[in-house]
Curated annotation (Swiss-Prot):
It is found in: Nucleus; Cytoplasm. The record marks S106, K145, W278 as: Interaction with m3G-cap structure. The lineage of its organism: Eukaryota, Metazoa, Chordata, Craniata, Vertebrata. GO terms for cellular component: cytosol; NLS-dependent protein nuclear import complex; nucleoplasm; nucleus; plasma membrane. Residues 11-73 form the IBB domain. InterPro entries: Importin-a_IBB, Snurportin-1, Snurportin-1_N, Snurportin1_C. Residues 7-22, 349-358 have a biased composition (Polar residues). It comes from the Eukaryota. Belongs to the snurportin family. Keywords: Acetylation, Cytoplasm, Nucleus, Phosphoprotein, RNA-binding, Transport. GO terms for biological process: cytoskeleton organization; protein complex oligomerization; protein import into nucleus; protein tetramerization; RNA import into nucleus; snRNA import into nucleus. Residues 315-341 have a biased composition (Basic and acidic residues). The modification Phosphoserine is found at S75, S351. This is Snurportin-1.
């Protein structure tokens, strides 16, 4: 335990927020065992099949988030409270549950999809912190992935200020990345717009809707008294080799953190999913086998070899049996992406045994 504590202390930046995006990504050995039992490609196939029959009540789910109305949920919370009392959990360490784990998170793109160029789209992401944005009843709230409300302000989102919140049904829920440097919420995805939920809609439609509706809200992309933070939609691009090369040669109005790859048919499902993949820009050449132009985005940092080696070893290990995979996961470590933003380490790891900055 002491060795583990020392390793964590040396690699994770200090933060009071659980799973803070100010901390580096978990190392490979923290990859959950349930993600080791099946290949990433197989889990993608199963999830696409599952979402065809899985129809959750997202209308009420979105309404609860917007109105902070959890009537009827108390019984389940009471059962959880009893379980926590039996486990003797410190009340001060319990997390807010209602707004926690509401964002769809990615996994490292390990198994390259055979239909990448046809069925996937890519979004270039800025350095920042993931945020759940809820605009309702004349106010806009920003929550962390862990469910903490970190800010309340007015915005020009539907339902986000007292002027445009004409009815209780005018609420909006967005998945964003907040850039403190640019004082901007970059919109990744839309879960609800003017009271209409989009959880069960495919990614390509959600993105189309988002980029159609955001420009209609005049002044949303400007910083004003009634809209103190800009809201800007992140563009998406095809995943063909030609498109990826063009994207990686572009200039962006923000510091680029990485690339999110979305399957076009993916519904918005809170939690980690293999239907959304994550790569740093310099990984595209090695992982996807795409020739990329030389430039700032594709320049490999000193620690790049360690990250790539772990991912490539994972791909090779999938030729082994399930038992060997599970053993290798605990030995060499395989991981899923719990954070989006990745701050730079002052002293990048130079040992394969050190924690990775991913």
């Amino acid at each position: 335990m002491e060795e583990l504590s020392q390793a964590l202390a040396s690699s994770f930046s200090v933060s009071q927020e659980l799973n803070s995006t100010a901390a580096p990504h978990p190392r490979l050995c923290q990859y959950k065992s349930k993600y080791s039992s099946l290949e990433q490609s197989e889990r993608r196939r199963q999830l696409l099949e599952l979402q065809k029959s899985k129809r959750l009540d997202y209308v009420n789910h979105a309404r609860r988030l917007a109105e902070d109305d959890w009537t009827g949920m108390e019984s389940g919370e009471e059962e959880n409270k009893k379980d926590e009392e039996e486990m003797d959990i410190d009340p001060s360490k319990k997390l807010p549950k209602r707004y926690a784990n509401q964002l769809m998170l990615s996994e490292w793109l390990i198994d390259v999809p055979s239909d990448l160029g046809q069925e996937w789209i890519v979004v270039v992401c800025p350095v920042g912190k993931r945020a759940l944005i809820v605009a309702s009843r004349g106010s806009t709230s920003a929550y962390t992935k862990s469910g903490y409300c970190v800010n309340r302000f007015s915005s020009l989102l539907p339902g986000g200020n007292r002027r445009n919140s004409t009815t209780a049904k005018d609420y909006t829920i967005l998945d964003c990345i907040y850039s403190e440097v640019n004082q901007t919420y970059y919109v990744l995805d839309v879960m609800c717009w003017r009271g209409h939920p989009f959880y069960d809609c495919q990614t390509d439609f959600r993105f189309y809707w988002m980029h159609s509706k955001l420009p209609e809200e005049e002044g949303l992309g400007e910083k004003t008294k009634i809209n103190p933070f800009k809201f800007v939609g992140l563009k998406n691009f095809p995943c063909t080799p030609e498109s990826l090369c063009e994207v990686l040669s572009m200039d962006f109005p923000f510091e680029v953190d990485g690339l999110l790859f979305y399957h076009k048919q993916t519904h918005y499902s809170p939690g980690s999913t293999p239907l959304v993949g994550w790569l740093r820009p310099y990984m595209v050449s090695d992982i996807l086998g795409v020739a990329v132009p030389a430039g700032p985005l594709t320049t490999k940092p000193e620690y790049a070899g360690h990250q790539l080696q772990q991912i490539i070893e994972h791909k090779r290990s999938q030729e082994d049996t399930k038992e060997k995979l599970t053993h290798k996961a605990s030995e060499n470590g395989h991981y899923e992406l719990e954070h989006l933003s990745t701050p730079k380490l002052r002293n990048p790891p130079h040992s394969s045994e050190s924690l990775m900055d991913n």
